[in-house]
């Protein structure tokens, strides 16, 4: 394997996770691409240009290039409008490849269904296998919608079905996602490979909690709960805010110590502040304990995790949940919704607690169990570090490279059959 073309239409690996549409997928693309480059595999990532000031090609790391493809206006486009720009994006990708000798890429790896549509055509034009990672699935999301969330359109469902049918290999984060691909999308089980994501074990490590709190301006004896992620209905930060109100109603004395950190930005074009969540905190009378922080880079984010007594991941659906893994790698227990891949990322009663559903009282119970029981918290924290160390991006990358090799072999057999 010499060269890999990676497609990430709707979000650039250069963007800060936690802003707009940037999240765990960005981390996944960056970490696996750089790990491949360390193994001598050249990686070229194609993403949509969102500014006229972006260079046509940028170096993410030695051996990893990011190619900005002009497809539609640089700003003002919602993700839901991007299907209308797939023709322009695909043309840009094909033009870039045409500058090389035939057979330049060994495989194309698409991320999310929009990229899968582009990868489908690239597969046919370039004569190389297509490996696809969905990251989220419309049918799964529609089965677990938040009250304020809009269902995914039929257009996306059809697009995903097409990509699932055409890809040579489908990468699932967990066995649960693999079952969803075969059960909901009729994927050929032989094409589905389970490859768990990793965590940056050099960046997310246990550290001095007191120092972490000082860096964030928090009192040493504060009771700190944290949410990290994009502020959108799917991620359900409102669940933590409501649980905070329930905790204070049960024990008003906690107000002097309790700090709830909400770290992330609103998801969507043109949004600057999490207005609805701020309004909810005010209406529930907890605005004085809820602090909103912008998305944090790796080192600063690790300090947030270390400072917290517990990290809440109340999502309505997660294909895996990288935030849960990062927090545990820092020695912080996680309270997570028992959905999607989170039961794999968090071992219930061992590294954190899983909550069935999103009822406020259940979340308040789980958070108080950890935060108000130092013995339990320390036991979970110790186990969490060991659990997280079982996941690494190097291991993920080795599995992906093996999947690429399998896809190439199968593709060649089909071509020469």
Swiss-Prot record:
<feature type="binding site">
    <location>
        <position position="136"/>
    </location>
    <ligand>
        <name>1D-myo-inositol 3-phosphate</name>
    </ligand>
</feature>
<protein>
    <recommendedName>
        <fullName>D-inositol 3-phosphate glycosyltransferase</fullName>
        <ecNumber>2.4.1.250</ecNumber>
    </recommendedName>
</protein>
<feature type="binding site">
    <location>
        <position position="10"/>
    </location>
    <ligand>
        <name>1D-myo-inositol 3-phosphate</name>
    </ligand>
</feature>
<dbReference type="GO" id="GO:0010125">
    <property type="term" value="P:mycothiol biosynthetic process"/>
</dbReference>
<feature type="binding site">
    <location>
        <position position="112"/>
    </location>
    <ligand>
        <name>1D-myo-inositol 3-phosphate</name>
    </ligand>
</feature>
<feature type="binding site">
    <location>
        <position position="24"/>
    </location>
    <ligand>
        <name>UDP-N-acetyl-alpha-D-glucosamine</name>
    </ligand>
</feature>
<keyword id="KW-0808">Transferase</keyword>
<feature type="binding site">
    <location>
        <begin position="21"/>
        <end position="26"/>
    </location>
    <ligand>
        <name>1D-myo-inositol 3-phosphate</name>
    </ligand>
</feature>
<feature type="binding site">
    <location>
        <position position="305"/>
    </location>
    <ligand>
        <name>Mg(2+)</name>
    </ligand>
</feature>
<keyword id="KW-0328">Glycosyltransferase</keyword>
<dbReference type="Pfam" id="PF00534">
    <property type="entry name" value="Glycos_transf_1"/>
</dbReference>
<feature type="binding site">
    <location>
        <position position="235"/>
    </location>
    <ligand>
        <name>UDP-N-acetyl-alpha-D-glucosamine</name>
    </ligand>
</feature>
<keyword id="KW-0460">Magnesium</keyword>
<dbReference type="InterPro" id="IPR017814">
    <property type="entry name" value="Mycothiol_biosynthesis_MshA"/>
</dbReference>
<feature type="binding site">
    <location>
        <position position="230"/>
    </location>
    <ligand>
        <name>UDP-N-acetyl-alpha-D-glucosamine</name>
    </ligand>
</feature>
<feature type="binding site">
    <location>
        <position position="318"/>
    </location>
    <ligand>
        <name>UDP-N-acetyl-alpha-D-glucosamine</name>
    </ligand>
</feature>
<dbReference type="GO" id="GO:0102710">
    <property type="term" value="F:D-inositol-3-phosphate glycosyltransferase activity"/>
</dbReference>
<dbReference type="Pfam" id="PF13579">
    <property type="entry name" value="Glyco_trans_4_4"/>
</dbReference>
<feature type="binding site">
    <location>
        <position position="308"/>
    </location>
    <ligand>
        <name>Mg(2+)</name>
    </ligand>
</feature>
<dbReference type="GO" id="GO:0008375">
    <property type="term" value="F:acetylglucosaminyltransferase activity"/>
</dbReference>
<feature type="binding site">
    <location>
        <position position="326"/>
    </location>
    <ligand>
        <name>UDP-N-acetyl-alpha-D-glucosamine</name>
    </ligand>
</feature>
<feature type="binding site">
    <location>
        <position position="296"/>
    </location>
    <ligand>
        <name>UDP-N-acetyl-alpha-D-glucosamine</name>
    </ligand>
</feature>
<comment type="function">
    <text>Catalyzes the transfer of a N-acetyl-glucosamine moiety to 1D-myo-inositol 3-phosphate to produce 1D-myo-inositol 2-acetamido-2-deoxy-glucopyranoside 3-phosphate in the mycothiol biosynthesis pathway.</text>
</comment>
<dbReference type="InterPro" id="IPR001296">
    <property type="entry name" value="Glyco_trans_1"/>
</dbReference>
<feature type="binding site">
    <location>
        <position position="156"/>
    </location>
    <ligand>
        <name>1D-myo-inositol 3-phosphate</name>
    </ligand>
</feature>
<dbReference type="InterPro" id="IPR028098">
    <property type="entry name" value="Glyco_trans_4-like_N"/>
</dbReference>
<feature type="binding site">
    <location>
        <position position="332"/>
    </location>
    <ligand>
        <name>Mg(2+)</name>
    </ligand>
</feature>
<comment type="similarity">
    <text>Belongs to the glycosyltransferase group 1 family. MshA subfamily.</text>
</comment>
<comment type="subunit">
    <text>Homodimer.</text>
</comment>
<feature type="binding site">
    <location>
        <begin position="16"/>
        <end position="17"/>
    </location>
    <ligand>
        <name>UDP-N-acetyl-alpha-D-glucosamine</name>
    </ligand>
</feature>
<feature type="binding site">
    <location>
        <position position="79"/>
    </location>
    <ligand>
        <name>1D-myo-inositol 3-phosphate</name>
    </ligand>
</feature>
<keyword id="KW-0479">Metal-binding</keyword>
<dbReference type="GO" id="GO:0000287">
    <property type="term" value="F:magnesium ion binding"/>
</dbReference>
<feature type="binding site">
    <location>
        <position position="306"/>
    </location>
    <ligand>
        <name>Mg(2+)</name>
    </ligand>
</feature>
